[in-house]
Amino acid sequence: MESHLNEQQISDFRDAFSLFDKNNDGCISREELATVLTRLGMAPSQEDLQDMIVAVDEDGNGTIEFDEFLAIMKKKLYENDKGDDEEELRKAFRIFDKDDNGFISRNELSMVMASLGEEMTEDEIDDMMKAADSNNDGQVDYEEFKRVMMSTWNITEIFKPHVTIWRYKP
């Protein structure tokens, strides 16, 4: 089993961490965790959120720092084989890639999020694009999309066992 993450993996996990760390203070609070999970379509209770924090919070300070986040992501990365998810990812990418040019534009992202009932501000759309567009070309290719989605799946898999009931928003 691989025991070290490469620089790209660490960078990807730092990007994922920053999506949660809304105030950029270097830690994920219960409120920040709730915000992101709600955007992912989940509605965990306050008790569920506390259980999630406790499961990852090694130093017991009530928040998740990057080193704690990285340790659990590394563990999950090597526990899970995501090979079966490749076709699902390609299908999801095609849903976003409305003009079928191999890229997701900001406009396509905005349209799909709106069609899913996600009311997002222009700044939130910009933040999503910035987080996904690692080569800064103004669009998201399949590999960038896959990186973000795999990080999201790993994150939800980490927290799922600690939630008593996942309530998905209609």
From Swiss-Prot:
Residue span, EF-hand domain: 8-43, 44-79, 84-119, 120-155
PROSITE patterns for the chain: EF_HAND_1, EF_HAND_2
Positions of Ca(2+) 2 binding: 57, 59, 61, 63, 68
Residues annotated to bind Ca(2+) 3: 97, 99, 101, 108
GO CC terms: cytoplasm
Binding positions for Ca(2+) 4 per the UniProt entry: 133, 135, 137, 139, 144
GO MF term list: calcium ion binding; enzyme regulator activity
Matching SMART domains: EFh (SM00054)
This protein's UniProt keywords: Calcium, Metal-binding, Repeat
SUPFAM superfamilies: EF-hand
Positions of Ca(2+) 1 binding: 21, 23, 25, 27, 32
Top-rank taxon: Eukaryota
Function of the protein: Potential calcium sensor.
UniProt record similarity statement: Belongs to the calmodulin family.
Protein name: Putative calmodulin-like protein 6
Organism encoding this protein: Oryza sativa subsp. japonica
Recorded name of the encoding gene: CML6
